[in-house]
């Protein structure tokens, strides 16, 4: 769709909505009755005062010695977000990476988040090798900096905690449908309420079909077909005991797009709308989560929570697997190495938290004692076909007749770990608080056992009731793939390898203005050490290499953010980050900057209420220049993307109806998002989306 068509459509839509709202106001004014206005009654949920994942306890953000961003459901709905990446755009500390193979990769403060250790769902470690079903979420918490003390192995940049919608005691039924200019559709049902006395439920159903802008070599469009079903039931056994059980299933099948290729100048080779994979390449994912959460209130001050979750993740991936040749130019031939592969991941997680408040020695203590565990299994079957040489413009090759089912050599990986943690938030008076904590962690894995002991300390000073100045020191760790160096031609063969560790010092300030706008500032210095460095030996007759744990990576930066209401009608969530990220000690990348770690990034999303029925949105998302390879030879230009939207609330046949129109990338800017030289994501052009939602 051309920009002019979108602009005209948006303009006409807004004029119509404004006229309708004005007419309704005039009609209302004719009624000679007293009207009491409640400002912000419909659009007032931008600010969140706490994050359950940051401290694993009911602690306000002003009492949390750590930078945390909470993106609420209101913003997720306003932006018509369908992927986690669209939600995380609202925090400048997160930069997008590759989207190849129908999943998303992100970096936090310049450190890539692992699919296995970078994501939580309701505090459970969550295997995130797919596009998360965000329709089940009530909010997304971005916990910044090393967080291993409470959750175990994790990246230095932080964690993403996805908090799910919970059962409601009051009746809830929302039905919505949205579509875009490419013909994509999404239908959603969100229901909740009371089943019987003391038993409530929440159910979500989603059916989505996506038509992408990019197409295959044979002219076929890439498509995606997704189904989501979720059910949570909660029963209050007694005044002190609550049982919560849940199940959800995601089926997600999509054609493969492993990303575009870049030349040495950072430009896309060939047509930016053409996919290098063949049209018969696909990924088919089925994910099931089932679990139980028990909450027991010992007394008004103390509670015990026990949680268990099983995640079964199965994926078939039939790849054409195109390979980018060296010095590739448009029209050159390239090879593809097809294969059919089946992956089976099983995540079994559990935790127990004992949390409460006690006072002794004139000090108030908010204490957390807990333990969590993970039982991990992975199995793979794979069968490969013969390599294919292809020149763009030729007829697309037929799909090879291979199947993973013919592979009889199942490749498996298994391990388990557990951790015990302690945390104490001590309040000495109205001005001073100190948070201390520690964790012992043990991993059991063949040839890769690992133990870690981690501290954490934070000091908070409150100049006033609504402000905080804090300093925080925390550590994190990520286990190595093996316990010892295993290479007879290496000088240090047999040397014990410790886990990769990270340390952070963060100084920050928080100020809650008029109980409706939260301002944050943070300065951080993160150091990741212990990565393996192998150096080649030229004149040693006995050994080829020497490997040490001398790797060092340093990321320093500043973050500023604001979230909440500026006036009764104007709401914002905005952030900016400056980042200086470098490999300080590395045999290959010494002094270089990691991929997709821009020096500057920023985000802004805002809403202005014209009337109680009509609100307008506008946002801008900026990513600075980024490197596309760790050698720092290819860079991607900076970009700014402008999004706009409008929501109109009315009643049809007595039912509340919300009409929403959004335009992403209003000015049709050309840009490259995340990914490297052979898997970069091309930003979508101007895209209009429309939603109708009704409540019963």
Predicted regions mapped to residue ranges:
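Acidic, small-polar-rich N-terminal luminal/periplasmic segments of exported/outer-membrane proteins
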Residues: 13, 31-170, 507
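Outer-membrane beta-barrel translocator/receptor signature
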Residues: 135-138, 149-229, 237-241, 288
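Acidic/polar loop-and-plug regions of large Gram-negative outer-membrane beta-barrel proteins
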Residues: 208-213, 219-223, 227-297, 310-345, ...
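Structural signature of Gram-negative outer-membrane beta-barrels, strongest in the C-terminal barrel
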Residues: 236-240, 345, 364-366, 372-374, ...
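Surface-exposed extracellular loop regions of Gram-negative outer-membrane beta-barrel proteins
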Residues: 251-267, 375-379, 459-506, 511, ...
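Membrane-embedded beta-barrel scaffold of Gram-negative outer-membrane proteins
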Residues: 293-309, 313-321, 462, 469, ...
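Conserved C-terminal beta-signal and adjacent last beta-strands/turns
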Residues: 343, 367, 471, 595-696
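Gram-negative outer-membrane beta-barrel transporters
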Residues: 431, 525-527, 548-631, 667-670, ...
């Amino acid at each position: 769709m051309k920009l002019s068509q979108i602009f005209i459509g948006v303009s006409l839509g807004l004029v119509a909505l404004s006229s309708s709202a004005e007419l309704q106001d005039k009609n209302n004014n004719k009624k000679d009755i007293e009207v009491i206005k409640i400002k912000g009654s419909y659009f007032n949920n931008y600010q969140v005062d706490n994050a359950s994942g940051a401290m694993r306890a009911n602690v306000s953000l002003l009492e949390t010695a750590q930078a945390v961003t909470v993106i609420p459901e209101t913003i997720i709905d306003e932006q018509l977000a369908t992927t986690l990446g669209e939600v995380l755009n609202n925090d400048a500390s997160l930069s997008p990476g590759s989207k190849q193979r129908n999943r998303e990769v992100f970096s936090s403060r310049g450190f890539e988040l692992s699919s296995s250790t970078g994501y939580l769902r309701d505090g459970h470690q969550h295997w995130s090798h797919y596009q998360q079903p965000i329709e089940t979420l009530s909010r997304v918490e971005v916990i910044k900096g090393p967080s291993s003390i409470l959750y175990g192995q994790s990246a230095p940049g932080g964690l993403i905690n996805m908090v799910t919608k919970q059962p409601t005691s009051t009746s809830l039924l929302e039905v919505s449908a949205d579509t875009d200019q490419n013909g994509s559709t999404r239908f959603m049902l969100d229901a909740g309420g009371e089943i019987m006395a003391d038993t409530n439920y929440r159910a979500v159903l989603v059916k989505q079909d996506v038509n992408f802008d990019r197409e295959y070599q044979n002219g076929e469009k890439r498509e995606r077909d997704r189904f989501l079903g979720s059910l949570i039931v909660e029963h209050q056994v007694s005044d002190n005991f609550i049982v919560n059980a849940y199940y959800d299933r995601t089926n997600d099948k999509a054609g493969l797009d492993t990303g575009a290729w870049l030349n040495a100048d950072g430009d896309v080779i060939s047509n930016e709308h053409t996919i290098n994979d063949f049209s018969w390449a696909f990924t088919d994912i089925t994910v099931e989560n089932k679990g139980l959460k028990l909450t027991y209130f010992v007394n008004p001050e103390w509670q015990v929570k026990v949680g268990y979750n099983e995640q079964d993740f199965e994926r078939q991936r039939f790849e054409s697997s195109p390979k980018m040749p060296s010095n590739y130019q448009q029209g050159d031939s390239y090879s593809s190495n097809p294969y059919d592969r089946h992956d089976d991941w099983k995540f079994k997680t559990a935790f127990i938290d004992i949390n409460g408040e006690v006072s002794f020695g004139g000090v108030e203590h908010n204490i957390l004692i807990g333990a969590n565990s993970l039982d991990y299994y992975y199995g793979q079957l794979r069968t490969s076909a013969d390599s294919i040489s292809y020149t763009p413009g030729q007829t697309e090759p037929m799909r090879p007749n291979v199947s993973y089912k013919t592979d009889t050599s199942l490749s498996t990986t298994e391990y388990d770990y557990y951790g015990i943690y302690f945390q104490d938030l001590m309040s000495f008076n109205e001005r001073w608080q100190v948070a201390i904590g520690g964790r012992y962690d043990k991993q059991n894995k063949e040839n890769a056992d690992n133990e870690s002991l981690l501290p954490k300390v934070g000091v908070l000073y409150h100049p006033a009731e609504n402000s905080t100045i804090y300093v925080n020191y925390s550590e994190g760790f990520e286990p190595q793939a093996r316990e010892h160096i295993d290479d007879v031609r290496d000088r240090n063969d047999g040397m014990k390898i410790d886990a990769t560790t990270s340390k952070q010092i963060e100084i920050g300030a928080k100020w809650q203005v008029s109980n409706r706008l939260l301002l944050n500032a943070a300065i951080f210095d993160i150091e990741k050490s212990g990565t393996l460095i192998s150096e080649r030996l030229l004149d040693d007759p006995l050994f080829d290499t020497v490997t040490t744990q001398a790797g060092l990576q340093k990321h320093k930066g500043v973050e500023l953010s604001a979230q909440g209401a500026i006036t009764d009608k104007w709401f914002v969530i905005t952030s900016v980050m400056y980042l200086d990220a470098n490999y300080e000690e590395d045999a290959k990348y010494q002094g270089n900057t990691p991929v997709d770690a821009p020096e500057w990034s920023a985000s802004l999303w805002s809403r202005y209420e014209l009337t109680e029925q009509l609100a307008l949105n506008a946002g801008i998302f900026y990513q600075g220049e980024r490197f596309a390879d760790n050698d720092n030879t290819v860079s991607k230009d900076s970009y700014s993307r402008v999004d706009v939207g409008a929501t109109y609330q009315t009643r049809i046949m007595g039912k509340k109806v919300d009409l929403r129109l959004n335009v992403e990338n209003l000015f049709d800017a050309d840009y490259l998002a995340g990914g490297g030289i052979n898997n970069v994501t091309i930003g979508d052009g101007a895209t209009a989306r429309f939603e109708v939602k009704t409540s019963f």
